[in-house]
Curated annotation (Swiss-Prot):
This is PHD finger protein 6. The modification N-acetylserine is found at S2. InterPro entries: EPHD, PHD-type_Zinc_Finger, Znf_PHD, Znf_RING/FYVE/PHD. PROSITE patterns: EPHD. The gene is PHF6. Residues 354-365 have a biased composition (Low complexity). The PHD-type zinc finger 1 mediates both nucleolar localization and interaction with UBTF. A zinc finger (PHD-type) spans 80-132, 278-330.
Length: 365
């Protein structure tokens, strides 16, 4: 009923994130909305939520997470009050086990929490301002360090901040410290670990399987993204589709096909390096080397994000055409094909005219 009311009001009322109840797209990433319009959530709010795990099913997903899981996490958040603003929806917990601080994503930023985000390694973690730590080589070292050294609580800077502990104590009254920790991270229904699998790109620390340099996942996505080709000498890997549509990769001819998915390995490595600076229009993660063919358009995607955002892929093997048009410009592909055909005919006509002119000059001599 609520969704129909929102649809009637339309322009006068914008959809808000189910976690932070705001429209803070700049801080929290793109606001993603399910096809049935019933679920809306910022990508960062989902990405860092403690109990969300990636979904590899064929069912509808939202930012790499199943709709059902997102709804469960939003429901769980109604019982979790933010350590900063004291409002519900705070599903992002400090990654130190004994800490029970929970946040909305934008509240974590405002409270000067440390955001650790390394998509290539599958790391999406938050440390509250009390437990911020730097200069660690690995996340395992970070957890071990926190377990060995109790950090002194920071002194309150103002009266306003000194009051923030009371609502948290009320919410967890009567619970043990271990119970508080698992409740804030949603691990009461799943096995507790210091390295929770909660993102579309996260893997366990012991998982050494190769992952695509573009989309940061492995062979589990081969069916949708093509075979994962591995180049052991350079410790590089990439899905076929991710390479095929990347703007700077060069596909080799049939007479000089290499083992790396028929692509020039140098161009693939260059694209992977370039992708580290290219953030996806949909998920805001690096590796988005597939750009819309319209020159004035700045949208870039991972292959699967382009599919999810309803971009249009043009794949013509006989002519070697592999292009993407974002959903705003998907109607331009037919006009683009016509332009190419006209250009091809024009080039052919110019070549014939040049041949005739050369022949006339020879006859004249």
């Amino acid at each position: 009923m609520s969704s129909s009311v929102e649809q009637k009001k339309g322009p006068t009322r914008q959809r808000k994130c189910g976690f932070c109840k705001s429209n803070r797209d700049k801080e929290c990433g793109q606001l993603l909305i399910s096809e049935n319009q019933k679920v809306a959530a910022h990508h960062k709010c989902m990405l860092f939520s403690s109990a969300l795990v990636s979904s590899h099913s064929d069912n509808e997903s939202l930012g790499g997470f199943s709709i059902e899981d997102v709804q469960k996490e939003i429901k769980r958040g109604t019982k979790l009050m933010c350590s900063l603003c004291h409002c519900p929806g705070a599903t992002i917990g400090c990654d130190v086990k004994t800490c029970h601080r929970t946040y909305h994503y934008h509240c974590a930023l405002h409270d000067k929490a440390q955001i650790r985000e390394k998509p290539s390694q599958g790391i999406y973690m938050v440390y509250c301002r009390k437990h911020k730590k730097t200069a660690h080589n690995s996340e395992a070292d970070l957890e071990e360090s926190f377990n060995e050294h109790e950090l002194e609580p920071s002194s309150p800077k103002s009266k306003k901040k000194s009051r923030k502990g009371r609502p948290r104590k009320t919410n967890f009254k009567g619970l043990s410290e271990d119970t508080r920790s698992t409740s804030s991270h949603g691990t009461d229904e799943m096995e507790s670990s210091s390295y929770r699998d909660r993102s579309p790109h996260r893997s366990s620390p012991s998982d050494t399987r190769p992952k695509c340099g573009f989309c940061h996942v492995g062979e589990e996505e081969n069916q949708a993204r093509g075979k994962l080709h591995i180049f052991n000498a350079k410790k590089a890997a990439a899905h076929y589709k991710c390479m095929l549509f990347s703007s700077g990769t060069v596909q080799l001819t049939t007479t000089s096909r290499a083992e790396f998915g028929d692509f020039d390995i140098k161009t693939v490595l260059q694209e992977i390096k370039r992708g580290k600076r290219m953030k996806c229009t949909l998920c805001s993660q690096p590796g988005a080397t597939i750009g819309c063919e319209i020159k004035a358009c700045v949208k870039t995607y991972h292959y699967h994000c382009g599919v999810q955002d309803k971009a249009k892929y043009i794949e013509n093997m006989s002519r070697g055409i592999y292009k993407l048009y974002c959903k705003n410009h998907s109607g331009n592909d037919e006009r683009d094909e016509e332009d190419e055909e006209r250009e091809s005919k024009s080039r052919g006509k110019v070549e014939i005219d040049q041949q005739q002119l050369t022949q006339q000059q020879l006859n004249g001599n």
